[in-house]
């Protein structure tokens, strides 16, 4: 009997919060039978299917499929032993029918000739439209048939079909049922379906009638019709629901609140086990046995798991398959693809145009009543070779101050009488003369720190130029450039890190939205159910995104170098290496964000929060050395290290042996390993919707 049992549920319960969805459920399903779960919405059908598939963890009881707990050691679930067609079609809208079937065949590692043979057979049975049609162009019924084809393509031992014939014409529905019966009779395939069309269930070997998470009755259709003296299964279900409702009312009205044993005796008289109306119900056995059945015939699966080399090959094969599918999806969406490639370049161009440049055309008032030439030389030095200042002659100081207050002027330079003589006396006879008339008065709006700093620098440069032209050295210092250039501008500092963070957040946002969509539309869980590991799924998306990253980065570098003069002095290979690594961190963080986000807007908001934190704490626009109180936080931001390394390579030509380079590389790789590990730990299908209340109860015990 153990070899014949495919599914065994023993006292299984499952809750969502305080609501019991299924309670003390007991049933077994035998090999080579078609079994139908019948019940209204909320009766627990989908929860039972998800528990069997390992997508939900039961609160209590034992669930065994092929003799093992789903997702447990040695289990065939997840894997290719099961075929699943969910109620939501869970297909990729951007690819064709052929690409869809080929993708799932590759996931199951089917030989090409076997795939073609099975594909052609399913096209005929399910009457699929042209294989070149894109999924989004199909009707709902056509999409459901394609979904069913993906569940059948690899010839699984267990088929779980949720509403497989909804929206399908009666003729095709009849052919589907004929094929399902053929599979059970000739290949011993076990099938579980849910449906609202009770008359379809006349072809089933077994029917389970559910209400409020309990089995009201089960058995072959003719047995149920005979037992309850009905001509239609709808009438049988109606009688059972009415009886169950009356028992519930009696229980509520009972003063003693006596517990009523409502377990159904599902043993069936032998005369109903084989009958003409039930097409293929040979050797059906319904049992509520509590004895765990352990199937020992899992040799091939155990050998594959124990062979690490083969496991790596499977991971690699799945990763390549997913990356090809993802690239195909992106290629089909032309506008999003172009936007994905161009938008970082547009942002970096906007950044270069708006940030880091020296201001120009600043209106400054000049009140110059100096009789000497030094004041004129100073004004000429300020205007020499640039258009930073736009000088306006002013005669009245108070009037100029009013213009500054009304924002008509940035400032006023008030040069006193005999300024030239005063400066000469200050420099050459400091003890003989006072410093009167040796200082000019500057009136400015000092609320703009950055602008004040730039103006101050220009004034100092002008005085140094006058002094140097006269052979006088004002400052007792000589600056020598060990790295960089004295003519470097602020963009040299900003560009390497800014290019990084733009693409970093772009990748994070793109991957988080992608994974939230795949999580919500069911496509992610579907491939995980077929044995695709979280490692392969993540690697597949990362591999698909790397070609786009390389194009993005190349365009940004060309813009930075040829349009805005940012130098690249170091090893270009190291530059690309750090760029790919930091964006891999961004992609992994995006996937991690998707695991805790219910909707795309949640993921976008989290990405925006990380972007703001990185912009402020990573030393991108201001040195991290200026962060005094919480400076240690900047060490936790990965873009700090990529910016540090890229500045070192691009501007300083630092070798790999320099501590800024190899330390940054180790830290970024550690981030990748850490986030990747969190994804792998958090994603496994068996841990979804885990009941933490039960876990805490066990801890207390």
Curated annotation (Swiss-Prot):
What is the recorded name of this protein? ABC transporter G family member 23
- Main location group: membrane
Residue ranges of the ABC transmembrane type-2 domain? 459-686
Q: Which family does it belong to?
A: Belongs to the ABC transporter superfamily. ABCG family.
Q: Known SMART domains for this protein?
A: AAA
- Output the Pfam families linked to this UniProt entry: ABC2_membrane_3, ABC_tran
Q: Gene name?
A: abcG23
Q: Name one GO molecular function term.
A: ABC-type transporter activity
Q: Which PANTHER family did the record assign?
A: ABC TRANSPORTER G FAMILY MEMBER 20 ISOFORM X1, ATP-BINDING CASSETTE, SUB-FAMILY H, MEMBER 1
């Amino acid at each position: 009997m153990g070899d014949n049992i495919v599914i065994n549920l023993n006292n299984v319960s499952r809750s969502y919060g305080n609501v019991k969805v299924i309670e003390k459920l007991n049933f077994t399903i035998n090999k080579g039978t078609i079994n139908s779960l019948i019940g209204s919405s909320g009766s627990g059908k989908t929860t039972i299917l998800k528990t069997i598939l390992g997508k939900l963890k039961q609160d209590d009881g034992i669930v065994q499929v092929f003799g093992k707990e789903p997702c447990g050691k040695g289990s065939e679930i997840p894997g290719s032993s099961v075929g699943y067609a969910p109620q939501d079609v869970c297909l990729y809208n951007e690819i064709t029918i052929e690409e869809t079937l080929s993708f799932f065949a590759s996931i199951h590692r089917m030989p090409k000739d076997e795939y073609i043979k099975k594909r052609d057979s399913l096209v005929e049975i399910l009457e699929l439209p042209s294989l070149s049609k894109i999924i989004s162009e199909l009707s709902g019924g056509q999409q459901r048939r394609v979904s069913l084809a993906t569940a059948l393509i690899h010839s699984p031992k267990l088929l779980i079909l949720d509403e497989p014939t909804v929206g399908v014409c009666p003729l095709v529905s009849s052919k589907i049922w004929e094929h399902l019966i053929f599979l059970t009779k000739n290949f011993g395939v076990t099938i579980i379906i849910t449906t609202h069309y009770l008359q379809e269930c006349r072809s089933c070997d077994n029917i389970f009638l559910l209400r409020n998470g309990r089995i009201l009755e089960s058995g072959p259709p003719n047995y149920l019709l005979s037992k309850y003296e009905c001509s239609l299964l709808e009438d049988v279900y109606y009688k059972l629901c009415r009886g169950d409702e009356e028992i519930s009312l009696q229980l509520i009205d009972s003063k003693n609140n006596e517990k009523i044993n409502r377990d159904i005796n599902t043993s069936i008289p032998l005369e109903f086990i084989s009958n003409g109306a039930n097409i293929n119900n040979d050797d059906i056995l319904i049992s509520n046995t509590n004895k765990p059945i352990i199937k020992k015939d899992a040799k091939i699966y155990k050998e594959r798991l124990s062979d690490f080399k083969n496991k790596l090959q499977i991971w690699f094969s799945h990763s390549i398959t997913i990356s090809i599918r993802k690239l195909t999806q992106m290629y089909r969406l032309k506008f999003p693809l172009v936007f994905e490639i161009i938008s970082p370049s547009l942002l970096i161009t906007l950044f270069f145009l708006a940030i880091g440049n020296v201001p120009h055309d600043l209106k400054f008032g000049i009140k110059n009543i100096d009789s000497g030439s030094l004041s004129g030389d100073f004004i000429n030095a300020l205007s020499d070779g640039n258009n930073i200042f736009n000088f306006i002659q002013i005669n009245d100081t108070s009037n100029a101050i009013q213009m500054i207050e009304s924002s008509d002027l940035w400032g006023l330079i008030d040069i006193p009488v005999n300024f030239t003589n005063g400066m000469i006396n200050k420099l050459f006879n400091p003890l003989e003369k006072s410093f009167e008339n040796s200082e000019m008065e500057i009136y400015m709006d000092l609320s703009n720190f950055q602008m004040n700093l730039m103006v101050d620098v220009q004034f100092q440069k002008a005085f140094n130029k006058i002094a140097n032209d006269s052979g006088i050295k004002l400052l007792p210092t000589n600056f020598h450039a060990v790295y960089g250039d004295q003519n470097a501008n602020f963009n040299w500092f900003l560009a390497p890190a800014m290019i990084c963070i733009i693409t970093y957040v772009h990748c994070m946002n793109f991957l988080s939205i992608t994974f939230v969509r795949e999580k919500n539309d069911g496509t992610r869980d579907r491939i995980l159910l077929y044995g695709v590991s979280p490692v392969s799924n993540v690697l597949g998306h990362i591999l698909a995104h790397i070609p786009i990253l390389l194009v993005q980065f190349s365009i940004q570098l060309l813009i930075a170098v040829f349009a805005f003069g940012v130098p690249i002095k170091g090893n270009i290979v190291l530059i690309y290496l750090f760029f790919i690594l930091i964006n891999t961190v961004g992609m992994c963080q995006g996937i991690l964000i998707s695991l805790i986000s219910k909707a795309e807007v949640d993921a976008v908001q989290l990405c925006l929060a990380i972007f703001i934190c990185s912009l402020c704490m990573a030393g991108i626009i201001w040195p991290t050395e200026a962060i005094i109180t919480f400076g240690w936080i900047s060490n936790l931001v990965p873009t700090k290290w990529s910016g540090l390394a890229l500045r070192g390579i691009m501007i300083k030509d630092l070798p790999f042996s320099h501590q800024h380079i190899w330390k940054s590389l180790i830290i970024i790789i550690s981030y990748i390993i850490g986030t990747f590990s969190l994804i792998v730990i958090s994603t496994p299908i068996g841990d979804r919707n885990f009941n933490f209340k039960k876990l805490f109860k066990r801890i207390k015990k």
